[in-house]
């Protein structure tokens, strides 16, 4: 593998399917699809000369993938540093896989659970914290609990980011808005890092900035 990475990171969408319907997540017109293990292996082989840092997320819920273990093993064998973003509804179910093939960082979108009335919050929080404790105890995985400050007021912790304990963090951000060519908002300043610092590969193999 090339020691000098061209991209800081590459996003690889292993599935476009999700088990939640969040109001803040832009609906896709693409058909639900799961990238096969062979397709994923090909992706890793082809991007290996450009980066060693991947995010298993664009749209969709990565923990839904039925062959997640095989995918993480491919990453491990290729010496890829892996981050994944999840709503964590399946984290207890997928815990054995995450223990067998630990990733560098798991980003948990807590606002996803808060946005779906179908979720039993008591069970969700219990399973999440129990799984986090196990991962923190048995692996070096870092866990970032992400919240959106929709009220735009000083947050409870007094800071946007804080460390709860070793490898466990809380990250507070403003709500993310997906780019929309039909939006009436136009910023006069800005710069797109797409194809400069990162790129993404969708589950059907399409490459996007």
Language model regions located:
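Conserved alpha-helical substructure of the radical SAM core
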Residues: 1-105, 117-119
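Accessory C-terminal segments flanking Radical SAM cores
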Residues: 11, 166-209
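Structural recognition of alpha->loop->beta junctions
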Residues: 44, 48-49, 94-115, 157-175
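Active-site beta-loop-alpha junctions enriched in small/polar residues
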Residues: 59-61, 87-89, 111-113, 148-150, ...
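Conserved strand-turn element in the central/C-terminal portion of the radical SAM core barrel
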Residues: 113-115, 131-161
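Well-ordered, non-membrane alpha-helical segments in soluble/globular domains
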Residues: 120-134
């Amino acid at each position: 593998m090339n020691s000098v990475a061209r991209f800081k990171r590459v996003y690889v969408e292993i599935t476009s399917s999700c088990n939640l319907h969040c109001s803040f997540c832009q609906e896709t017109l693409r058909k639900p699809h799961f990238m096969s293990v062979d397709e994923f292996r090909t992706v890793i082989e082809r991007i290996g000369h450009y980066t060693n840092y991947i995010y298993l997320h664009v749209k969709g819920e990565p923990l839904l993938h039925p062959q997640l273990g095989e995918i993480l093993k491919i990453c491990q064998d290729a010496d890829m540093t892996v981050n994944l973003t999840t709503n964590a509804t399946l984290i207890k179910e997928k815990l054995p896989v995450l223990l067998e093939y630990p990733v560098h960082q798991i980003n948990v979108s807590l606002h996803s659970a808060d946005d779906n009335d179908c979720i039993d919050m008591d069970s969700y929080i219990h399973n999440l914290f129990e799984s986090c404790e196990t991962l923190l105890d048995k692996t070096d995985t870092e866990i970032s609990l992400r919240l959106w400050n929709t009220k735009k007021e000083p947050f409870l912790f007094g800071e946007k980011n804080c460390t709860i304990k070793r490898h466990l963090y809380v990250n507070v951000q403003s709500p993310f808005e997906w780019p929309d060519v039909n939006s009436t908002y136009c910023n006069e300043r800005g710069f797109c890092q797409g194809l400069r610092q990162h790129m993404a590969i969708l589950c059907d193999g399409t490459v996007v900035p």
